[in-house]
From Swiss-Prot:
It comes from Rhodopseudomonas palustris (strain BisB5). This is Small ribosomal subunit protein uS11. The gene is rpsK. One of its GO terms (cellular component) is ribonucleoprotein complex. Keywords: Ribonucleoprotein, Ribosomal protein, RNA-binding, rRNA-binding. InterPro entries: Ribosomal_uS11, Ribosomal_uS11_bac-type, Ribosomal_uS11_sf. One of its GO terms (molecular function) is structural constituent of ribosome. GO terms for biological process: translation. Part of the 30S ribosomal subunit. Interacts with proteins S7 and S18. Binds to IF-3.
Length: 129
């Protein structure tokens, strides 16, 4: 029984000038992933990981806080320009995009990649409040 050594896993610093920000905003949460051009994840964050729980995860403010966090992580890797792909019907779409622009990124293009079914799966039942 030798002495257990704890190995510190250090994140390697990549120098990537441009990337793609994938903003997925559902009715319950907003996740933001920044990848390089090949799709390898550089940094990610979500409203849930920022400490918001329950119905507060779906607010625009929670999406803004998550976008500021992921922007800080991506700028540590030297990222300057972004293409933004927005998906989903949630309320955090625009606020996450505005937070990425305010963080100092140059946004070259904004694409809406929300999937639209051609009469696929049956939708969930209507809410009666």
């Amino acid at each position: 029984m030798g002495k257990e050594t704890t190995r510190i896993r250090r994140r390697e610093r990549k120098n990537i000038a441009s990337g793609i920000a994938h903003v997925n905003s559902s009715f319950n949460n907003t996740t933001i992933t920044i990848t390089d051009a090949q799709g390898n994840a550089i940094a990610w964050s979500s409203a849930g990981t920022m400490g918001f729980k329950g119905s507060r995860k779906s607010t625009p403010y929670a999406a803004q806080v998550a976008a500021e966090d992921v922007a800080k992580k991506a700028q540590e890797h030297g990222m300057r320009t972004l293409e933004v792909e927005v998906a989903g019907p949630g309320s955090g779409r625009e606020s996450a995009l505005r937070a990425l622009q305010a963080a100092g990124f140059t946004v070259t293009s904004i694409r809406d990649v929300t999937t639209i079914p051609h009469n696929g799966c049956r939708p969930r039942k209507r809410r009666r409040v």
